From Swiss-Prot:
Superkingdom: Bacteria
Name of protein: FMN-dependent NADH:quinone oxidoreductase
Co-factor binding details: Binds 1 FMN per subunit.
GO terms of molecular function: electron transfer activity; FMN binding; oxidoreductase activity, acting on NAD(P)H as acceptor; oxidoreductase activity, acting on NAD(P)H, quinone or similar compound as acceptor
Catalytic activity: 2 a quinone + NADH + H(+) = 2 a 1,4-benzosemiquinone + NAD(+); N,N-dimethyl-1,4-phenylenediamine + anthranilate + 2 NAD(+) = 2-(4-dimethylaminophenyl)diazenylbenzoate + 2 NADH + 2 H(+)
């Protein structure tokens, strides 16, 4: 039995969110194949820690036992991670960024020790992540920004194995109901869920 943690981050209402909808469908397909796995879903919009932003005023206390350590210990206790994120102003939502700020802690999730100068080692190398992203613009429209690449790079930095990402793009340029759009991605979702 594997333990799976799912992070939903869209500030869009659940019934209107593409990233949440596609992540939910992915989890449903995954559960069909892995019925014994334990799945925990966290909506970061209603998660206290993800409301806390790192500032100069709280830097000394931000990475604390009740917040950072608890989240890191949870990540160390699970086998797989599913992260759903829309693009908000060319980046991930603030709630997800706040969560990531809490877990990126030197000598806990990454380290510069025991590596060549200028290199690092990720300490979450037991984990595998499935990234599911959505954005209003088609892929490649904005070369200066890719929230998918940002997440892939960050999780790679932490030593996490990255499954091929699922990118739902162009949702505002060629608007379709999410249920209709899902039909275009259904086989990809089923395939990637079976391989995850």
């Amino acid at each position: 039995m594997k333990k799976v943690l799912v992070l939903l981050s869209s500030p869009v209402a659940k019934e209107n969110s593409y990233s949440t909808y596609f992540a939910t469908k992915f989890v449903e397909e995954y559960q069909k194949i892995n019925q014994e796995d334990e799945i925990k879903i966290i909506d970061l919009n209603s998660f206290d820690v993800s409301q806390k932003t790192l500032t100069s005023g709280n830097f000394a206390t931000f990475f604390n036992e009740n917040d950072s350590d608890a989240l890191i210990n949870e990540l160390k206790s699970v086998d797989k991670l599913i992260v759903a994120s829309p693009m908000i102003n060319f980046n991930v939502p603030a709630t997800l960024k706040n969560y990531l700020d809490h877990i990126c802690v030197a000598n806990k999730t990454f380290s510069y020790k025991y590596k060549a100068k200028g290199a690092s080692i990720g300490l979450l190398d037991h984990l595998k992540v499935q990234i599911i992203t959505s954005q209003g613009a088609p892929s490649g429209w904005y070369s200066f920004s890719s929230h998918t690449k940002y997440l892939e790079g960050l999780f790679n930095f932490l030593g996490i194995e990255i499954a091929p990402s699922i990118e739902i793009t162009g949702t505002k340029v060629d608007p379709k109901p999410k249920e209709e759009l899902y039909l275009e991605f259904e086989q990809e979702i089923i395939k990637k869920a079976s391989e995850f």
